Amino acid sequence: MYVRVMAAVIACILLSGEALSAFAITPATENLSWFKKKKKKPEEREEKSKSDYEKLVEGSKTTKGMFAVHQKKNDFYFEIPTALLGRDLLVVNKLQRVPAELNEAGVNRGVNYENQMVCMEWDKASGKLMFRQQRPLPLAPRTDAIFRSVQDNFISPLIAAFKIEAVNADSTALVIKVNDIYDGTETSINNVFTNINLGTSAIKNLSRILSIKSFSNNVVATSELTTRVTEGTTTVYVTVEVSSSILLLPETPMMGRFDNQKVGYFTNPLLNFSDAQQGTDKTQYITRWRMEPKPEDREAYLKGQIVEPAKPIVFYIDNSTPYQWRSYIKKGIEDWQVAFEKAGFKNAIIAKEITDSMHVDMDDVNYSVLTYAASEKKNAMGPSLLDPRSGEILEADIMWWHNVLSMVREWITVQTGTVCPEARKVQLPDDLMGDAIRFVACHEVGHSLGLRHNMMGSWAFPTDSLRSETFTSRMNSTASSIMDYARFNYIAQPGDGVKVLSPHIGPYDMFAIEYGYRWYGKNTPEEEKTLLFNFLSKHTDRLYKYSEAQDVRDAVDPRAQNEDLGDDPVRSSLLGIENLKRIVPQILQWTTTGEKGQTYEEASRLYYAVINQWNNYLYHVLANIGGIYIENTTVGDGIKTYTFVEKEKQQAALKFLLNEVLTYPKWLFDTEVGQYTYLLRNTPVGKQENAPTQILKNAQAYILWDLLGNNRLMRMIENESVNGKKAFTVVELMDGLHKNIFGVTERGGVPNVMERSLQKNFLDALLTAAAEPEAVKINKKIADEHFLLDHATPF
């Protein structure tokens, strides 16, 4: 028996594994393990082998958000959900810190230097994640046959490819290494040195990633990038700190709103196709924030009740802003609330000071910030971040360069010093400066809301009305729009009793915000067209006129100019000059502080500011000569689009120029202050002194060159051909100039040195004009296509 049992056991040991397993469950084999040779189990039987994903995330520092960000030592990885593949993303690149050389040029923290829309695609064949630059497709009705062509005809470029390092366990996320796009190696989504006009590349071993953060709908990388710039035999290293964000755009774009030439909004153009067309055209959507009532308030809103928006606009004031100015900036931002109430929304725009107790991360691109930059640049700027598909403003940054305060201070003194005793000091009181800071902030926020400059705002107020205490108090401004370059009331004379001297929100601003932000509850832009037309038809008064900015030296419409006030340029400028004549004898007194060792630098600064103001007045008047009134017309409104400036006004303009600049303005250039200081001017090589007579010669030369420019002369010739004797002609212009400039010589007299200088300027201008090409296209368009950022003039 024993032998048979042992034979059976040995036979079982020789069976296959499956047979052994079946046999092993019988009671007879429970204690036979001593027959087996003991082997150490392989490690993989104790623990499953780790996947590429598990190996990658093991030991990583991980941040959760739109993408999970994994950091292993100096390597950074994005874990990208496959649900986001194909979604539209916006890359937003900003400067965070810059060297002194760039800072002095106004390239500072917060400047947005490059944006582009992208999407991601998984190329499974190559094992790569592709970045494709997305360009909004042209518009076309889905029911039209041409819609298929729009979908099939256009392709956007691939700009970057990433090896897929790992896929998570359930294949819902891909992992890519992103060092190259943030350390300067790859420039497809961040090309800072090209965009700030250095045209160089980052040096890899001198560039690095500082951090990457992930938020709910965006991820931001902060990098320190270094380049080498060579000029001649000199090499300079330039390091900048930049942030590069990838922002998830709304899955459903905001409904666009059509632009109208009667209202000044920045626009987002999209090509438009349809079967009914016999050509192509562009649809222009205005740029604006998504401002909608809450779902539960929509019925009340449409009945005319004022409600709170579902999402208000919030601006954060940078904690580097000097304390004494913060309240004024806050007021300037929130001044727009009255305009939003006209559009049916209360508490629609809010300003908050950033404090240490706030849980606000300024690296999150969702936050709109007023950034205060320690810079010599004299300006402020209000750019916006747009969804290119719809024109929706997603975020806005107000750039505030510190030295704008010096320019504002000069305006206050030069434009209001004769009627405001507090303006006659080197160091102005905080409340006076604060009022000016408030209007600058308000103007810049207007840009951040989508509004363009409206240079017709100042013309809306009659010149003489700006001397009325009653009118100025009622209108509470110097113009109908804060978006004009209308500064302080230089027209008011001592004794007029005018108290309101600065610009504020006006009728045009409220009208423009209502056009852009009133919610109609419609589903398509086309459904709003009639409602918007009806709204515009109720606002035809001069208070609601709009006109773009023009070239200062060749303005076509004299009503729409920079730095002007009133509707009569000659009278406004004469009143302004009367005030300047009162200021010049007081320059030394107003700029003397009593400080031991004080120089005449402040006197020189104020003297130069007075001359600049005088020069502004000259060009306000010059625009009348050869000028054309240009209206934004529609068929059937009974208004002419183009009307030449009246002959009498052009004659008065020439008389003004002959009396005020094409002569020797002794009151301005033969002064006591000129005995103590020359005019100081900042140049790229430092401060430069200029003799007053040199400044006068330059002013006369520019006026004569611009009077005799071909564009102006061709407009005058056209006027004469259309209106005959009712026109102010080129012959009359030349005759007036010749008689005035050479009058002494023709009468047999001997011209003095200043008269000879003017005669030479006139001859130079004639030679310059004669050298211009004869064929000139008559320019009736006021301005070229707009730029979202203003560079040429302050604000």
Where are the regions a protein language model picked out?
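Soluble non-cytosolic domains of exported or imported proteins
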Residues: E79, V111, T280, N319, ...
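Sec-exported extracytoplasmic/periplasmic mature domains
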Residues: E334-F345, G446-H447, L451, F488, ...
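Conserved catalytic/binding loops enriched for acidic/polar residues
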Residues: S458-F795
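Bacterial N-terminal signal peptides that target proteins for export
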Residues: M1-M6
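The catalytic-center signature of Zn2+-dependent metalloproteases
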Residues: L32-F35, K48, E353-A373, D435-A492
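C-terminal segment of classical bacterial N-terminal signal peptides
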Residues: L15-A22
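Extended catalytic-interface subdomain
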Residues: M381, L386, E392-D397, A441-L449, ...
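Auxiliary tRNA-acceptor-end handling modules of aminoacyl-tRNA synthetases
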Residues: P27-Y77, P81-T321, A339, A348, ...
